[in-house]
């Protein structure tokens, strides 16, 4: 009997597999970290073979440790780090280069050239995105231009492109299926969100052959089956795909227009469900596809913050101020406030709503009174301030008032941060009992496609662990936020040559 769904959650720092029962409970999980490669300043890469190796490894591990046979699995769903770009040889299945990660900034000069060509407004209106090295399109161009023989092979139909979801499905099906879903396609800067197809004008400008791109499918349907050699002969339907942030929006149950969530991971990612009509931002946000199910497309506004949890890792690994990420709450709590200190973690530039590829990190407001506690606290507060930047932009674009912010991801377990988040946005923050909503969303999408769950089931399993309500008065809130805005302004354009 098929009593379970498995979610494969392939993130920036690790690959995970989570096993769910029909009540939406986590039965077992497994996780393996993946190596970060930094070959040059502002370059970030992953070994695509390691991504597959770790992901297939945890898939097998979670079955073995749970004592579950593959034929007991009803479906597999995939949530993945978005924009990260893999190009591989169609025949051998081997990547031609390391995957270029979403954080990588090497293609900033290509982005500048696109702006000089007057494509800024065309790309914003048709893809919903801004021209930035964050997205896949310029990464594909860079790989075709810089890997020996790649462009010729691509034109001859010998190479395939995919975001991480495509790469995993290709391997799960042993090269039989080359697909992506609308959510991931909408993050490439090559996809027209109105025509719901690859954009020929952008492909032509970047000289990217359409033939190397995956077929685009809905977020909840059967794309293919695991190859008989992958999981002991079992052919399990792969039936749910969503980029990690859209998956979290779905996993949080943000099914109605105006509902919003924030995921605190390596970066911070806020998404607001805007319903069946795309809202083109005038305030530095992205317009993206939330999900596509049963022929209906739902859109979202997104604010992408590049550095969030990664700033806490920086405190631990680079500055050695803390031993573990969990220590951050303890040390931050030793100071009642950050004493006018602001940390702007623009290590890879600034994302929404600023979109400055040349901003760099800074600590502002240092005095002799400042010690470890203040710097740790200011670093945590930077996550909340960046969230406020995006929340304000979303209110302007959507013309909707935010009632509640739903949160998930590792850092949302930090009570001090969640209280400050509520204080600085002046809104209730809700934390669910299961904070692994990214994996949950992919599981839900997969289960829906095979009839394991229905929409009513998904609404029943949403449970709130804690609510944080504002305790800071409005004048203090605005004074602190004004200091943040001043600090951000100082960091902008820092790494520009001229």
Swiss-Prot record:
The keyword Kinase applies. It catalyses: glycerol + ATP = sn-glycerol 3-phosphate + ADP + H(+). InterPro entries: ATPase_NBD, Carb_kinase_FGGY, Carb_kinase_FGGY_CS, FGGY_C, FGGY_N, Glycerol_kin. One of its GO terms (biological process) is glycerol-3-phosphate metabolic process. Sn-glycerol 3-phosphate binds at residues 12, 82-83, 134, 244. Glycerol binds at residues 82-83, 134, 244-245. Homotetramer and homodimer (in equilibrium). One of its GO terms (molecular function) is ATP binding. Its EC number is 2.7.1.30. Transmembrane segments: none annotated. Pathway: Polyol metabolism; glycerol degradation via glycerol kinase pathway; sn-glycerol 3-phosphate from glycerol: step 1/1. It comes from Natranaerobius thermophilus (strain ATCC BAA-1301 / DSM 18059 / JW/NM-WN-LF). Belongs to the FGGY kinase family. The keyword Kinase applies. Activated by phosphorylation and inhibited by fructose 1,6-bisphosphate (FBP). Keywords: ATP-binding, Glycerol metabolism, Kinase, Nucleotide-binding, Transferase. ATP binds at residues 12-14, 266, 309, 313, 410. This is Glycerol kinase. GO terms for cellular component: cytosol. Key enzyme in the regulation of glycerol uptake and metabolism. Catalyzes the phosphorylation of glycerol to yield sn-glycerol 3-phosphate.
């Amino acid at each position: 009997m098929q009593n379970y769904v498995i979610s494969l959650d392939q993130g920036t720092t690790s690959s995970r597999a989570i096993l769910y029962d029909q009540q939406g409970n986590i039965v077992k999980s497994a996780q393996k970290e993946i190596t970060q490669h930094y070959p040059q300043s502002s370059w970030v890469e992953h070994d695509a073979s390691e991504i597959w190796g770790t992901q297939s490894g945890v898939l097998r591990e979670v079955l073995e440790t749970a004592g579950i046979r593959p034929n007991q699995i009803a479906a597999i769903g995939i949530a993945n780090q978005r924009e990260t770009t893999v190009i591989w040889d169609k025949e051998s299945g081997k990547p031609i280069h390391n995957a270029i990660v979403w954080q990588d900034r090497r293609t900033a000069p290509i982005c500048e050239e696109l702006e000089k060509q007057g494509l800024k407004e065309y790309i914003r209106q048709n893809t919903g995105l801004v021209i930035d090295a964050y997205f896949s399109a310029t990464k594909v161009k860079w790989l075709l231009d810089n890997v020996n023989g790649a462009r010729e092979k691509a034109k001859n139909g010998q190479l395939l492109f995919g975001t991480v979801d495509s790469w995993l499905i290709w391997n799960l099906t042993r090269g039989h299926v080359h697909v992506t879903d609308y959510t991931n396609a909408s993050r490439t800067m090559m996809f027209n969100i109105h025509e719901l197809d690859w954009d020929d004008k952008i492909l032509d400008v970047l000289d990217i052959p359409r033939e190397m791109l995956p077929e685009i499918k809905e977020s909840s349907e059967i794309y293919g089956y695991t190859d008989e050699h992958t999981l002991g002969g079992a052919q399990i339907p792969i039936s749910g795909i969503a980029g990690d942030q859209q998956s979290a929006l779905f996993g949080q149950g943000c099914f109605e227009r105006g509902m919003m969530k924030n995921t605190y991971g390596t970066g911070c990612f806020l998404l607001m469900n805007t319903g069946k009509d795309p809202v083109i931002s005038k305030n530095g946000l992205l317009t993206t596809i939330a999900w596509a199910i049963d022929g209906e497309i739902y859109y979202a506004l997104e604010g992408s913050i590049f550095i969030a949890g990664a700033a806490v890792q920086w405190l631990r690994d680079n500055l050695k101020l803390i031993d573990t990420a969990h220590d951050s709450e303890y040390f931050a709590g030793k100071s009642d406030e950050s004493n006018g200190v602001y940390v702007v973690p623009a290590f890879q530039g600034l994302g929404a709503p600023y979109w400055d590829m040349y901003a760099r990190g800074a600590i502002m407001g240092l005095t002799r009174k400042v010690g470890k506690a203040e710097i740790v606290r200011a670093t945590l507060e930077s996550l909340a301030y960046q969230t406020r930047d995006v929340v304000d932009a979303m209110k302007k674009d959507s013309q909707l008032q935010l009632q509640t912010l739903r949160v998930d991801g590792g850092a949302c377990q930090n009570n001090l941060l969640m209280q400050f988040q509520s204080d600085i946005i002046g809104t209730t923050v809700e934390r669910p009992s299961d904070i692994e909503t990214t994996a949950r969303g992919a599981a839900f999408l997969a289960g829906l496609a095979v009839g394991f769950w229905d929409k009513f089931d998904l609404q029943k399993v949403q449970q709130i662990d804690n609510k944080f309500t504002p305790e800071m008065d409005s004048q203090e809130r605005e004074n602190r936020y004004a200091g943040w805005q001043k600090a951000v302004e100082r960091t902008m354009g820092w790494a520009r040559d001229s």
